[in-house]
Amino acid sequence: MRCLPVFVILLLLIASTPSVDARAKTRDDMSLASFHDDAKRILQILQDRSGCCVIDSNCCG
C-alpha cells in the first residue's frame, strides 16, 4: 500500500511530459507533399520529352 502513492505520482509525471519524436529528423525524412511534387515534375518531363501522355495511353496513338 505504501507504493501506491509513488506509483500514482509517477503516472502523473509521465502523462504530463511533453511529447517528442522518438528519433531525430534526418535528411531522408520528406513530407508526402514533396513526393507528390516530385512525381508531378517527373511526369511533366516525360510528357514534354516524348510528346505523349504518360498517364493516358489513348493520346499516344
Curated annotation (Swiss-Prot):
Main subcellular location of this protein, as a coarse class: secreted
Signal sequence coordinates: 1-22
GO molecular function: toxin activity
PTM remark: Contains 2 disulfide bonds that can be either 'C1-C3, C2-C4' or 'C1-C4, C2-C3', since these disulfide connectivities have been observed for conotoxins with cysteine framework V (for examples, see AC P0DQQ7 and AC P81755).
Subcellular location: Secreted
Keyword Disulfide bond: yes
Prosegment location in residue numbers: 23-48
Keywords, comma-separated and alphabetical: Amidation, Cleavage on pair of basic residues, Disulfide bond, Secreted, Signal, Toxin
Tissue expression remark: Expressed by the venom duct.
GO CC annotations on file: extracellular region
Domain of life: Eukaryota
InterPro entries (alphabetical): T-conotoxin (IPR031565)
Family named by the database record: Belongs to the conotoxin T superfamily.
Domain notes: The cysteine framework is V (CC-CC).
Protein name: Conotoxin Tx-D021
Source organism of the structure: Conus textile (Cloth-of-gold cone)
